[in-house]
């Protein structure tokens, strides 16, 4: 796997800070409380995968949140442009980060195996 350039890493880091600010300016309270786990920009910085954390949202709520985020993408991009001074901003593709759920399931499996070995 090739290392990311320093400029790309800086862009991702800055977006990871600015996107939550943009979300906090929106009127939908479900969007205000979302946490940004990771931002992964494409090489040309035209697209960015934004991984979000909403641990207490149901699958239906997550679908609705993603729909609202698609509608608010322009506002979020405008905020990022004004906050950073950039002349272009990547298109955002929002996804929920499920790595913590997977880790919790693995921990539960390991705990169950440990109990079975002890008995």
UniProtKB/Swiss-Prot annotation:
Gene3D superfamilies: 3.30.300.20. Its main location: cytoplasm. Keywords: Cytoplasm, Ribosome biogenesis. The keyword Cytoplasm applies. It is found in: Cytoplasm. GO terms for biological process: maturation of SSU-rRNA. GO terms for cellular component: cytoplasm. InterPro entries: KH_dom-like_a/b, RbfA, RbfA_dom_sf, Ribosome-bd_factorA_CS. HAMAP family: RbfA (MF_00003). One of several proteins that assist in the late maturation steps of the functional core of the 30S ribosomal subunit. Associates with free 30S ribosomal subunits (but not with 30S subunits that are part of 70S ribosomes or polysomes). Required for efficient processing of 16S rRNA. May interact with the 5'-terminal helix region of 16S rRNA. Monomer. Binds 30S ribosomal subunits, but not 50S ribosomal subunits or 70S ribosomes. Belongs to the RbfA family. This is Ribosome-binding factor A. It comes from Wolinella succinogenes (strain ATCC 29543 / DSM 1740 / CCUG 13145 / JCM 31913 / LMG 7466 / NCTC 11488 / FDC 602W).
